[in-house]
């Protein structure tokens, strides 16, 4: 089980990562990582970066059957 400090240190080393990448790297369940990232965000230590839907080259994101699942969410330290 990873700690909040380990999540912060991993983000410091990698620059930016997705929550799923952090979960796999630290061998910690995704809901736990999501909670830790939200806590870091509330503390002002981490920032959530969401991709702009205008960046879709095909323009089909608006009609995507997966509900914009192709849009990625990154985390980085402040």
From Swiss-Prot:
Iron-sulfur cluster binds at residues 56, 61, 64, 70. InterPro entries: FeoC, Tscrpt_reg_HTH_FeoC, WH-like_DNA-bd_sf, WH_DNA-bd_sf. Gene3D superfamilies: Winged helix-like DNA-binding domain superfamily/Winged helix DNA-binding domain. It comes from the Bacteria. Keywords: DNA-binding, Iron, Iron-sulfur, Metal-binding, Repressor, Transcription, Transcription regulation. May function as a transcriptional regulator that controls feoABC expression. This is Probable [Fe-S]-dependent transcriptional repressor. It comes from Citrobacter koseri (strain ATCC BAA-895 / CDC 4225-83 / SGSC4696). The gene is feoC.
